[in-house]
């Protein structure tokens, strides 16, 4: 409702709706914190909506990181997770299903009311949220507020999800026979093969919870989003991808990598938590001589592939730092850990401060699952990559790294010891690797320019703040 003549408009109240699984909520919180800081002069307040378990994890991470406390104009608001109280142990896919069913059945509307109550009755003027929680679109419309979704993955993956119906019509039941066919008839996707598409687009179980979720999201975004935040920066996406998205979503706002928005979100590079001594170990290694290996917190190779990877790292002769969950250590080759520790040639740890590691001058190669956050962290650190994708959008990301941007290589299928040794040697010392290393440095410079004073990402984030706060 507009204020009467002579009355001033109340300050903006932005509801930020999280998808409380994996790293989604943490990424959205980094944006919310940057938004809260930028919008403070307008008197804006933000309500960050997530489940109890998600908020507990965020609070724990904040307490462990200096400077990561909430701004005074940003509050946490707990929302139900949709699970029956009697269910004590619920698998994550089922948790996602229950959460999204609750969201679609009017849950988001109730959450916005909870945000209003927590803000002393202040009406929600804009709904910013993880794009996965697409029911927020209707809830925002009911509240008379615009919906501004945040996409956390790559632009090419978003394009694939939006074009899912057209891709299914094109590929039909021939996905298995056309795995290497380029998607040349689909604007923005001509550099990608059928096999690179995310799970559930043209193959796999279309009714699996996450596949249903992103399909519905892809249908909802073009008709309901007032603007869409993209986790990329101008100059990274090829022109055909940018043009295809702009035709479907005319108000895209690219200002990624999101972790660079606030200096304190990068604080772990200055004084990182490093309980396993990764940085001290790196300090004893040659410049650009170390291969860093990590597949994130979800993906993990099979035991036989882990053994091949371990053998390949040893055969490469390069020092390596490997972040690997401890429950996978028993699958490593006999004596591998002892040999690495005894010679000082390798360090295997259950966790590493990844951004700080990638920025260390001793790291010259990154063996990764090609999750989008990891790709951006490696890219913004100028480190070439060897990608072993497993699921989701990782195959598209690996294809982008190797064939679109050219600052790395991609394994086709499972890793072998010979393949790992060759990839690591090439990235660190090879002639083709020199080209990849140079390309990685070019992209690193583009990121630095985009986030420097007057850079395009800074300008775009200012535009995002204006869109969110003008309602």
From Swiss-Prot:
Protein name according to UniProt: Anthocyanidin 3-O-glucosyltransferase
Catalytic activity entry: an anthocyanidin + UDP-alpha-D-glucose + H(+) = an anthocyanidin 3-O-beta-D-glucoside + UDP
Natural source organism: Zea mays
GO molecular function term, any single one: anthocyanidin 3-O-glucosyltransferase activity
Active site, UniProt feature: 24, 130
Entry binding sites for an anthocyanidin: 24, 161, 392
Cited function: In the presence of other necessary color factors, this glycosylation reaction allows the accumulation of anthocyanin pigments.
CDD domains documented for this protein: GT1_Gtf-like
Binding site for UDP-alpha-D-glucose: 152, 352, 354, 369, 372, 374, 377, 393-394
Pfam families linked: UDPGT (PF00201)
Annotated disulfide bonds: none
EC number: 2.4.1.115
Pathway assigned in UniProt: Pigment biosynthesis; anthocyanin biosynthesis
Enzyme class: transferase
Record keywords, A-Z: Glycosyltransferase, Transferase
Family: Belongs to the UDP-glycosyltransferase family.
Superkingdom of source: Eukaryota
Gene Ontology biological process terms from the UniProt entry: anthocyanin-containing compound biosynthetic process
């Amino acid at each position: 409702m507009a204020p009467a003549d002579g009355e001033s408009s109340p300050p903006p109240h932005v509801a930020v709706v999280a998808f409380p699984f994996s790293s989604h909520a943490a990424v959205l919180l980094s944006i919310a914190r940057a938004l809260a800081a930028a919008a403070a002069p307008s008197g804006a307040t933000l309500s960050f909506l997530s489940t109890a378990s998600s908020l507990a994890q965020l609070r724990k991470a904040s307490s462990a990181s200096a400077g990561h406390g909430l701004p005074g104009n940003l509050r946490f608001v707990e929302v139900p997770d949709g699970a029956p109280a009697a269910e004590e142990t619920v698998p994550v896919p089922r948790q996602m299903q229950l959460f999204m069913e609750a969201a679609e059945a009017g849950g988001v509307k109730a959450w916005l009311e909870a945000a209003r109550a927590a803000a002393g009755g202040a009406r929600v003027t804009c709904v910013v949220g993880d794009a996965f929680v697409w029911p927020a679109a209707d809830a925002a419309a009911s509240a008379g507020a615009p919906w501004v979704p945040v996409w956390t993955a790559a632009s090419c993956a978003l394009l694939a999800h939006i074009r899912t119906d057209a891709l299914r019509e094109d590929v039909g039941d021939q996905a298995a026979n056309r795995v290497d066919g380029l998607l040349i008839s689909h604007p923005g996707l001509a550099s990608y093969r059928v096999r690179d598409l995310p799970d559930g687009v043209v193959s796999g179980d279309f009714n699996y919870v996450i596949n249903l979720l992103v399909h519905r999201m892809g249908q909802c975004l073009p008709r309901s989003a007032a603007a869409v935040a993209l986790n990329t920066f101008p100059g990274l996406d090829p022109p055909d991808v940018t043009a295809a998205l702009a035709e479907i979503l005319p108000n895209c706002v690219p200002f990624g990598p999101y972790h660079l928005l606030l200096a304190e979100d990068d604080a772990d590079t200055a004084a990182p938590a490093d309980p396993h001594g990764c940085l001290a170990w790196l300090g004893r290694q040659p410049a650009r001589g170390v291969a860093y290996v990590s597949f994130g917190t979800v993906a993990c190779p099979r035991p036989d592939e882990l053994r091949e990877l371990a053998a390949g790292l040893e055969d490469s002769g390069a020092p390596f730092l490997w972040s690997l969950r401890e429950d996978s250590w028993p699958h490593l080759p006999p004596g591998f850990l002892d040999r690495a520790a005894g010679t000082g040639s390798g360090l295997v740890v259950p966790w590493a401060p990844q951004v700080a590691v990638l920025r260390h001058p001793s790291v010259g190669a990154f063996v990764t699952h090609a999750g989008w956050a990891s790709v951006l962290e490696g890219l913004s650190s100028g480190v070439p990559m060897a990608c072993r994708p497993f699921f989701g959008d990782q195959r598209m990301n690996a294809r982008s790294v190797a064939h679109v941007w050219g600052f790395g290589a991609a394994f086709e299928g499972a890793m072998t010891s010979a393949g790992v040794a060759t990839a690591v040697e090439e990235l660190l010392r090879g002639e083709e690797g020199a080209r990849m290393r140079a390309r990685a440095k070019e992209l690193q410079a583009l990121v630095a320019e985009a986030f420097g004073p007057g850079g395009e990402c800074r300008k775009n984030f200012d535009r995002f703040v204006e869109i969110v706060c003008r309602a």
